[in-house]
A protein has these predicted regions:
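Secretory targeting and sorting signals
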Residues: 1-22
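Residues that scaffold, gate, or flank divalent-cation-dependent active/transport sites
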Residues: 301
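Beta-sheet entry/capping signal
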Residues: 101, 296-298
Length: 338
């Protein structure tokens, strides 16, 4: 019944185009993946930036509803950019032809703040599941990123709906023999997740929603303390490992490290100094991440990977550092391996 209901609502999903169907829907991403965020709210081409930067895998941010109360997903909440092969489809096909792939990301700070994150916006669990399935089948993707922060961390009804929808999608995927993975991207402190972040994961366990990766955003701490960003990343990840041990006591430490993702904000983050992630930090984190065997290494955002605004904090288009174009991408990209 769950599968049938979910598939019925998912009828809005158009059949895959020949270009989409050429990609094996069961193909697994590399076990250890560098996948920087691409700002889909810009006019940039994912394919072009992937080619220029050398970033073969991109996380496309963000998908949200046009208004609170809606159950319709669009890119950036804009009806002019629907979930359809006509939006990003050709780019995705070219990225795949070059040996890469994409991960669509739902939510993000703006959507989580204004109630347009799909599970906060939509009151129907089957409709939320159908939205996830629509993205999966339209773009033939095997992983979805759920960026859950701000008000989405305290909206208990939305948390419950989201995790119930994840479980529905996983049941559907098993029924139709599709590989589907879910990533929760959540903020962290140096001392680990806030209780709200832990609650999101506890609720997932309650509803038997399999979360494949917990991706922590190791930036924007806003605590007015001095920070050594690479060291703080390692510390926060160690605390996350402890949380995962509590949630999944039968899993080994190796398996739990492979549930962890890290997202840095390269250069000067939104808070500004002293939260500056340097090129040296990137080298240290990439080496540490390979050593620990984490699943994902990402950064916000590909469009920021240039030295166009030295000293500027929190820009969407440059890192605030003196650097060469795509320098962080070059440091992080070797992390991708099986």
């Amino acid at each position: 019944l769950v599968v049938a209901l979910s598939l019925a609502i998912a009828g809005m999903a158009a059949p895959a185009t020949p270009a989409a169907a050429a990609f094996d829907a069961g193909s697994r991403l590399p076990a250890h993946l560098c996948t920087p965020y691409f700002e889909a709210y810009t006019t940039d081409s994912p394919r072009q930036l992937s080619h220029e930067s050398g970033a073969r895998y991109l996380t496309l941010a963000f998908l949200q509803t046009p208004a609170p109360g809606s159950c319709t997903i669009t890119w950036n909440g804009d009806p002019a950019t629907p979930v359809a092969w006509s939006t990003y489809g050709a780019d995705i096909a070219r990225i795949r032809a070059a040996g890469g792939d994409v991960i669509p990301s739902f939510g993000g700070y703006s959507a989580d703040h204004d109630g347009t994150e799909i599970a906060d916006s939509c009151a129907s669990v089957p409709a939320i599941a159908a939205a996830y399935e629509h993205v999966i089948t339209t773009y033939n993707v095997t992983r979805l990123d759920l960026d859950t922060e701000d008000n989405s961390l305290t909206n208990n009804a939305g948390i419950d709906r989201r995790n119930r929808a994840i479980a529905m999608v996983e049941e559907w995927a098993a029924h139709v023999h599709r590989l589907v993975q879910f990533v929760y991207t959540v903020p962290t402190n140096v001392a680990g997740l806030d209780p709200t972040g832990v609650h999101v994961l506890q609720n997932a366990v309650l509803h038997h929603a399999r979360i494949d990766i917990v991706n922590i955003m190791t930036f924007d701490y806003y605590d007015n303390l001095p920070h050594e960003m690479a060291n703080d990343t390692r510390t926060a990840a160690g605390h996350l490992l402890g949380t995962l041990h509590d949630l999944y006591p039968n899993r080994s430490s190796v398996a739990l490290w492979h549930m962890i993702g890290i997202t840095e904000m390269i250069g000067i983050d939104d808070f500004g100094p002293p939260e500056i992630f340097t090129l040296a930090d990137a080298h240290h984190v990439q080496e540490w991440a390979r050593d620990k065997g984490i699943a994902e290494l990402s950064f916000w955002a590909l469009e920021r990977d240039n030295g166009g605004c030295p000293g500027v904090a929190g820009s969407d288009s440059c890192s605030g550092l003196t650097q060469s174009a795509w320098q962080f991408t070059g440091i992080f990209s070797p992390f991708t391996h099986n």
